[in-house]
């Protein structure tokens, strides 16, 4: 999927780029709900590859098609729910559409109208590749009722419209959590199969190799690591902290200190040269940084290390 070339911050933006009607979609709220059969009237339909920067829930009562996410292709059939989150390349294909509800929302909407720390209660929103899940008839009936209420509020003009929608989204997320994600453990996924975590760790490792070899002398920021994966910086930060138990800043700091300690054990390297190799413009800044994390200055660490060898 590496050749996909559409990047979309919202569903409205995606539909515009795909040449589809956006009449039923609001542009600014960060939330949408609509029935796909109203948009896709000429079937079969296959989208171009795209990378969305929003969450999607697809509730399929009567339809058939396929959904490709990165290198995995899933069959989508009736009475299923399909969830995707920001970041992965994907393609959707529809052969039959009679009753299918798509709900999308951005992280900003979640944090403003659901909860500012939404991932603490709904950590499954950070799961990266989730195959379609089959609902029992009772489960689907409950979800369908919530979809109907969300659609009604979305099309209405209530004074507290987005707050009402936010409350209904909480109910929907709780149902999905109850049905499928009671045992979801982000740390376990982070250790085992998180592609976002793996890519971040590889990027971190490669960057420090470039620093130490002299290929670059500029430290990357958290924003730079997010840009490498075409993710919003807040989303990447949430994924890394939830799935590793450490913030991105902590990962960077730990790597800085590890590499600094290794170089301080080489008497041929001056502290000024070590600071420069790690991207610090001034040696005092590096010394203060090292002492903050190690409670000892670089010179003190070096002396302590060589004393321990004698």
Model-derived regions: residue spans:
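Short hydrophobic/aromatic patch on the recognition helix
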Residues: 79, 236, 285-286, 290
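Generic protein-terminus/edge-of-domain signal
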Residues: 1-65, 72-74
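Short, Lys/Arg-enriched, Trp-marked, Pro/Gly-tolerant hinge/linker segments that flank
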Residues: 158-163, 178-224, 242-247
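Terminal helix-turn-helix DNA-binding modules in bacterial transcription factors
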Residues: 242-283, 303-310
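A hydrophobic/aromatic-rich effector-binding and dimerization subdomain
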Residues: 2-4, 95-155, 175
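Short beta-strand His + acidic residue motifs that chelate non-heme Fe in jelly-roll/DSBH
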Residues: 67-68, 84, 90-95
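Short acidic-glycine-tyrosine-enriched beta hairpin
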Residues: 71-83
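…primarily DNA-binding HTH/wHTH and HhH modules…
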Residues: 287-310
